[in-house]
């Protein structure tokens, strides 16, 4: 078993060292516990203007076994960086880690026996055959709209050809909906391995603009298009569940952006006065 840990980064010099430390620790733990397994760490520069790229280069000089440096198109966003990372990946499973987050030391060891297309710590707990209607019914509502790039591991062979869209936010929701729609097997409710920091200033979750509002709306419509063809005849109340998901997504992730966007616009206008 080999893992490809993909870390997109841009202007993350404050958090990237801690992130890398956690991933390297998980890779070392894997090598010690499961000598037949391995990991590669693919750090993709999404257009940093700070010292992030230099930090990765310094780490690569001391640990060339684990760190691969690559460039994504400048200002193309996290989706393009993840796409570039997938192009370079050679592992059996893909694990995505944001540069302002960390993973637990036992993260990769806990995934070393994975065989499913998707392995997530989200509920429901168990192993599900997604080629059967009961598998889709049990997992659709809890996962669609909640499954993100970082809260699951994905079998690389099942990912083939699936790309993150060019959106400034919520691009991973579109990708995970597409992945869920094509997956044949899923394991849920495993022990959490990811440590998400929602409070890091400048992180994607804390960056707001009018452009993000438009991107969030675009993501909701793409999510619908991604999952709809896969569920005909599966007994899933697709329209009711998806509309509820989209409404929640709209309220929580789109309308919540509007006051911030308006405040930013008012501030820009005041700042532009003579």
Where are these regions (language model features)?
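Conserved nucleotide-sugar donor-binding catalytic segment
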Residues: 137-210
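C-terminal subregions of glycosyltransferases and related glycan-biosynthesis enzymes
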Residues: 188, 192-274
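Short aromatic/hydrophobic "clamp" motif used to bind/position activated sugar donors
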Residues: 94
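Acidic donor-binding/catalytic loop of UDP-sugar-dependent glycosyltransferases
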Residues: 51, 101-113
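Short, well-formed alpha-helical segments that are part of the catalytic scaffolds
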Residues: 12-31
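Short beta-strand/loop segment that forms part of the nucleotide-sugar
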Residues: 32-47, 69-73
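A conserved acidic beta->alpha catalytic loop
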Residues: 15, 22, 45-55, 74-75, ...
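Glycine-rich, basic loop-to-helix element that forms the pyrophosphate-binding segment
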Residues: 72-89
């Amino acid at each position: 078993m080999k893992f490809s840990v993909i870390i997109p980064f841009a202007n993350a010099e404050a958090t990237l060292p801690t992130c890398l430390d956690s991933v390297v620790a998980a890779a070392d733990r894997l090598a010690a516990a499961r000598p037949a397994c391995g990991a590669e760490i693919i750090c993709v520069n999404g257009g940093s203007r700070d010292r992030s790229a230099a930090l990765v280069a310094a780490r690569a000089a001391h640990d060339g076994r684990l760190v691969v440096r690559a460039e994504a198109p400048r200002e193309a966003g996290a989706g393009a960086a993840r796409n570039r990372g997938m192009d370079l990946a050679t592992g059996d499973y893909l694990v995505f880690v944001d540069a302002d987050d960390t993973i637990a030391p036992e993260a990769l060891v806990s995934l070393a026996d994975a065989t499913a297309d998707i392995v997530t710590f989200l509920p429901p707990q168990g192993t599900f055959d997604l080629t059967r209607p009961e598998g889709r019914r049990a997992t659709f509502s809890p996962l669609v709209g909640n499954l993100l790039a970082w809260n699951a591991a994905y079998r690389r062979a099942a990912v083939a050809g699936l790309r993150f869209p060019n959106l400034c936010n919520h691009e991973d929701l579109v990708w995970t909906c597409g992945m869920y729609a094509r997956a044949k097997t899923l394991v849920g409710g495993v022990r959490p391995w990811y440590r998400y920091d929602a409070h890091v200033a400048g992180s994607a979750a804390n960056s707001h603009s009018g452009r993000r509002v438009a991107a969030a709306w675009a993501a909701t419509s793409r999510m619908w298009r991604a999952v709809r063809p896969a569920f005909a005849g599966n007994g899933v109340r697709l329209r009711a569940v998806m509309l509820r998901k989209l409404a929640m997504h709209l309220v929580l992730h789109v309308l919540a952006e509007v006051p911030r966007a308006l405040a930013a616009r008012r501030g820009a206008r005041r700042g532009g006065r003579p």
